[in-house]
């Protein structure tokens, strides 16, 4: 479970945020971004000593000042349930495109390819000098016009 997915799921729920300087903020999570910056509503801020309290309509907390986050257990359970259902839906690798080298010759509607240039394998003869009729003196083959 990733912290950002947990925070995205916790939107609208109450949470406690403790900062590195010791202050705590209790409020409802409105939003968070990829740097874990947090926007809270209906916030009660408690000083480091716990002797002063402030009520604020909303608050923005920078992500790199956060030491601790407490989210409700129901949010954690919901995220774990979503992760489990995601893994149950399809096994890893199903539905993904294969890499270039992983082509299967038995693919439906495809002819197997030759093994290389100029080989007598039924495939194309390549673009080298002289084609199949170059030595017999006929037209074609060769690089010149004549």
UniProtKB/Swiss-Prot annotation:
Name the job this protein performs: Binds specifically to the 3'-terminal U-tract of U6 snRNA.
Organism, scientific name: Nicotiana tabacum (Common tobacco)
The terms under GO molecular function for this entry are: U6 snRNA binding
**GO BP:** nuclear-transcribed mRNA catabolic process; P-body assembly; spliceosomal snRNP assembly
Which key words tag this protein in UniProt? Answer: mRNA processing, mRNA splicing, Nucleus, Ribonucleoprotein, RNA-binding, Spliceosome
Protein name, as recorded: Probable U6 snRNA-associated Sm-like protein LSm4
Q: Name one GO cellular component term.
A: P-body
Question: Residue ranges under compositional bias (Gly residues)?
Answer: 137-146
Subcellular location(s) per record? Nucleus
The residues forming a coiled coil are: none
């Amino acid at each position: 479970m990733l912290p950002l997915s947990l925070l995205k799921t916790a939107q609208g729920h109450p949470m406690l945020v403790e900062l590195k300087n010791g202050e705590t903020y209790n409020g409802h999570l409105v939003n968070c971004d990829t740097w874990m910056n947090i926007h809270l509503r209906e916030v009660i801020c408690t000083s480091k000593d716990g002797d002063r309290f402030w009520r604020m309509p909303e608050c923005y907390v920078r992500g790199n000042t956060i030491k601790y986050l407490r989210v409700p257990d129901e949010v954690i359970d919901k995220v774990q349930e979503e992760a489990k259902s995601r893994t149950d839906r399809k096994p890893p690798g199903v539905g993904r495109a294969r890499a270039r080298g992983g082509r299967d010759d038995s693919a439906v509607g495809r002819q197997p390819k030759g093994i290389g240039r100029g080989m007598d394998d039924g495939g194309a003869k390549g673009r080298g000098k002289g084609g199949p009729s170059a030595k017999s003196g006929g037209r074609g083959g060769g690089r010149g016009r004549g």
